Amino acid sequence: AIEEGVVDLEKDTFYDSGSVIVSGARIGCWKAGGHGHQTFLQVLESSCNPGVVKLGNLLGKERLFSYLDLFGFGSKTGIDLNGESKGIIFPLDRVGELELATTAFGQGVSVTPIQQVTAVSAVVNGGSLYKPYIVKSFLEPETNSVIKSYDKTFVRNTISKETSDKMKYALESVV
């Protein structure tokens, strides 16, 4: 939403009454009665599901799902491990209001831990997504010389450096 310019984390606001109704389903906030009036930075800091649903709606399903794809969700990362799963993402033609809402706050998808780490790494790496790997190099045990090594493999840009900087600030403000 930041990259697309649909929200300013510190200026735009949301009122959390404690829940939101989406396609007849109640999506609640963890805090009974809600958080009240918040900036979207505070929505992220307080992990407010209704606020994140609003962000998903502002972004729209096409843009949200294009970012899921851009960050590698729903695809194998190519990591050097057998048995990697691609995770489960709704097909875009089956995404209604409820699927958009739950996907926005992370409960409408199934991702692997390595996909999550790869995506977060891209967010804090200036937007650059790299292929993950488990082993950087193999060393000969007696001489400690490198037998084989792997270089960083750039895959694609996901977000701008400016958005990355804003996201780093937001992530740091949570802890």
Q: Where are each of the predicted segments found?
A:
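Beta-lactam-recognizing serine transpeptidase/beta-lactamase-like catalytic domain environment
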Residues: 2-175
